Amino acid sequence: MANIQEKVGLGSGEPSAETGKGKSKIDKHVKHGYHTAKGKSSHPMEDFVFAEFRQVDGNELGLFAIFDGHVSQKVPDYLKANLFNNILDEPDFWNETEKAIRRAYHFTDDTILEKYADLGKGGSTAVTAILINCEKLVVANLGDSRAVLSRNGKAKQLSIDHEPESERKDIEERGGFVTKFPGDVARVDGQLAVARAFGDKSIKKHLSSEPDVMVETIDDDAEFIILASDGIWHVMNNQEAVDCVKEIKDARAAAAALIEEALKRNSGDDISVIVVRFH
């Protein structure tokens, strides 16, 4: 089944959304679906989603990612077009997958900085998940988009929220500083609400582009994974997100339901959700 993309709405008066779905060719039970919704801000949608199954060197890879941009769309759009290709171009991807992903993240960030004249001063978070032959899941992330696995109905976070407060020591050792004003979140150099990101050339020397990488075996206890931008996690915790979608067998409907719930809870940010069901 080919990946299907559509432009839809979440209902009367709701922002327009991008949605899509697809399924594995080697395991008919493994399916993905995604949904997005623009937030309340006046700027264009800055979340970008990548979701597809791809046959590579006789293996099947499920490639899933959410790129949550800031300042402009150019960096997340570049990541959508290039990050997975850069990962798969690493010569030792199959033998040392975690190291290959780390190198590809750094290479991609270096390239973004080199292309500053074209891509501008913006940046992006990222959470990527690579499903290898429906058996092994490798998750990497920069920033605060999140990956959460449901295992026997219990939420397990497979990413790290890279918040300025928790990485204050590293930021200060690089010559930066963290501000925390009343009514606002902590920010690097008074600007960025995450401590790790792609791009952001103006404050790059105070940020990190080193991803956290986690590996998970997909067995009978692993039910589904949620990838979502921070528009979800600002209004619900991991277990609430799992509980919201666990009874919805259609992955695309599950992603849409999670966004609907976030909107009910007054999330004002751009929201993107991918759900991958394993059985």
Question: Predicted segments — roles?
Answer:
Residues 1-279:
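PP2C/PPM-type serine/threonine phosphatase catalytic domain
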